[in-house]
Swiss-Prot record:
Subunit structure as annotated in this protein's UniProt entry: Homodimer which binds Holliday junction (HJ) DNA. The HJ becomes 2-fold symmetrical on binding to RuvC with unstacked arms; it has a different conformation from HJ DNA in complex with RuvA. In the full resolvosome a probable DNA-RuvA(4)-RuvB(12)-RuvC(2) complex forms which resolves the HJ.
Active site: 7, 67, 139
PROSITE patterns per record: RUVC
EC number annotated for this UniProt entry: 3.1.21.10
UniProt cofactor(s): Mg(2+)
GO CC, alphabetical: cytoplasm; Holliday junction resolvase complex
UniProt source species: Geobacter sp. (strain M21)
Family: Belongs to the RuvC family.
InterPro entries on file: RNaseH-like_sf, RNaseH_sf, X-over_junc_endoDNase_Mg_BS, X-over_junc_endoDNase_RuvC
Keyword terms of this UniProt record: Cytoplasm, DNA damage, DNA recombination, DNA repair, DNA-binding, Endonuclease, Hydrolase, Magnesium, Metal-binding, Nuclease
GO biological process: DNA recombination; DNA repair
Keyword field contains Magnesium: yes
Protein's UniProt name: Crossover junction endodeoxyribonuclease RuvC
Length: 164
């Protein structure tokens, strides 16, 4: 199963693609879509949508996992983040892909084993789990973490369905 993880942001949207083969997780690609803050916000949303649509067309994931919105101190920032998430989700559902959402705490729990892990701990675990030569860029690392979270969650769901 190929999983696309997305860490949405209005300035940088991270993506991480992994392949789950049995119990193995294999790194496929990761990176970020950068938008220019000088551009009008709708143009930035279009760049997120188009960039993710191209990534979906290239790698053909079977499922998309997106990090859920955190509570921001600034209401305007929270609204922009929500709109960036919307652009990312629409890129997936536009081609019929299922979308699963995970909180930051769920992602940290799945990757490190504790929902209160520090960002550096998560990055080091991703490097180890995916056998990366170096720690991925922050937004890409977060997206890989979301993909890993889904891989673990999907595996658990499949096990539970088999028990019933």
């Amino acid at each position: 199963m190929i999983i696309l993880g997305i860490d949405p942001g209005s300035r940088k949207t991270g993506y991480g693609i992994i392949s789950k083969q049995g119990n193995r997780l294999i790194h496929v690609d990761n990176g970020a879509i950068f938008t220019q803050s000088a551009k009008d916000f709708p143009e930035r949303l279009e760049k997120i949508f188009t960039g993710l649509s191209e990534i979906i067309a290239q790698y053909r994931p079977e499922v998309v996992a997106v990090e859920d919105v955190f509570l921001a101190k600034n209401a305007q920032s929270a609204l922009k983040l929500g709109q960036a998430r919307g652009a990312a989700i629409v890129a997936a559902v536009n081609v019929g892909l299922p979308v699963h959402e995970y909180t930051a705490m769920q992602v940290k729990q799945a990757v490190v084993g504790t929902g209160r892990a520090e960002k550096a701990q998560v990055q080091q675990m991703i490097k180890a789990l995916l056998n990366l030569p170096e720690v991925a860029q922050e937004d890409a690392s977060d997206a890989l973490a979301v993909a890993i979270c889904h891989a673990h969650s999907a595996g658990m769901s499949a096990l539970l369905k088999g028990v019933r």
